[in-house]
Amino acid sequence: MRHPIDPKVDCVFKALLGAESNRDLLIHFLNAVLGADLTRPIVAVEIQNPYNEKEFLDDKLTVVDVKARDATGQMFQVEVQLLNHRDLPARILYGWANLYRSQIKEGESYRKLRPTYAIWLLGQTLLPDAPEYAHEFRLRDQHGRVFLDHGGIWLLELSKFAADAVETEQQRWLKFFNEAERLDEDALPGWMQTPEMRRAMNTLKAFSEKEHAYYAYQARQDFLREQQSIQLEFEDLRAEVEQARAAADEARAAQEQERAAKEQARAAEERERVAKEEALAENERLKRLLADKSESSGTGTP
């Protein structure tokens, strides 16, 4: 290829799995990711929002996920997200719920609802406390019982995937997304020697060889880099704000400790003053007693 192409850039991703000419690749990808959870393999899909090269070249490509329906009515959403943000989990859940809801109109029976699957490829780690790269979320109770087997959300964290050997088709796809940009099409490794991977490389080659497509790809990549820079600046600013807030909290805590210490000191001084007054009063009382005894002794009958 004339230029390296990253399949994770959203426009390439959309062409790879969302173009009508690559429908077989989408089917293969869906079976690779969901195969173990499907009652039967997917054999055909209808892409609901197919990739439109003209929209991409005119910089009007705004919907970059892939939505599809199979022959049984099951719904699928596939999306790549290179940058994390605070609201990403809510966006993922909303996207799944919105696609699930879109199956019926007002007044239609709930029986028309079919399982809906959302697959997200993530460029950055979203779940740092979990060592696994693949996560499956379904509607289950605390004992693991499924409330309704109507699909779910699959997250694939590419930053955690580091398998050297390919053992499953899912791993083959993830390795492709992670490494395809650095591969030499004239010396592809063994794990790339499948019809699906060669077709996927042909899609990347089309972006590399067509000058107008490559310039548009570069513009999209530059936009994503700018977004990443803005995100990093925002995170730095947020970290500074958090540090300032923590410093202010520490200062307030120190002031509170100082105030409490002063209160304790004043209380101690007050106790000491009261003790002194009580001691003086007791001393005066004893003096008076002695004086009274002395007077009684002096005036008494011999």
Which residues does each predicted region cover?
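Conserved single-residue anchors adjacent to enzymatic active/cofactor-binding motifs
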Residues: 1-209
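Short, charged alpha-helical interaction segments and adjacent helix-coil junctions
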Residues: 76-81, 175-302
